Regions:
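ATP/NTP-dependent adenylation/nucleotidyl-transfer catalytic domains that generate, transfer
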Residues: 1-172
Length: 172
């Protein structure tokens, strides 16, 4: 994992250098689901001046890509990107360890709707998955404090609209 994170950080440094040389801003492409789960690397894929899709969950990002292609009646977002298994692409044949069809709505219910474990289980989610995801959201708050500011499109986004302590084993 340390070597994979190093790869992401080197890539981030290269992209920041290119942006700097071109007098441009690097856009961050982290989404709400990955950010919630801490499935991102500080000073790596979290680099950037503006997180343009940070308030869209993983499923919404794919939906947006498909919508763009349909709206413009041509392939702007490559089909290969929209149809492949999600991956951080930090090792050979790596795929993300989450089923985003389940996890993205769960993250939305926790973050946007403020559901607690009891309400989540009532809604049909598995208790253990709920506990795991809530714990990940709590554990990785420190990363979100260091991420690029994002564009808010939901009623509850990470950033100034949602800040929690990062010390003293704070529980959500």
């Amino acid at each position: 994992l340390a070597e994979e994170n190093l790869q992401a950080r080197i890539r981030g440094n290269i992209l920041m250098t290119i942006a700097n040389k071109k007098d441009a801003l690097l856009l961050n492409t982290g989404n709400k689901t990955e950010t919630a789960l801490g499935y991102c690397t500080l000073y790596g894929d979290m680099c950037g001046a503006l997180a343009v899709i940070s308030d869209l969950n993983k499923n919404e990002v794919y939906g947006l890509g498909n919508w763009i292609n349909e709206k413009y009646e041509k392939t702007i977002i490559p089909e290969s990107s929209l149809n492949k298994a999600p991956s951080a692409e930090l090792s050979h044949n790596q795929v993300d360890p989450f089923d985003y069809k389940i996890i993205s709505p769960l993250v939305e219910d926790i973050i946007t709707n403020g559901y607690n474990v009891e309400k989540l289980v009532e809604s049909g989610y598995d208790y253990e998955i709920c506990r795991e995801i809530i714990n990940r959201i709590r554990l990785f708050e420190y990363k979100r404090h260091q991420g690029a500011p994002g564009i808010r499109v939901s009623k509850k986004a990470f950033g100034t609209g949602r800040r929690y302590p990062i010390i003293n084993q704070y529980k959500i």
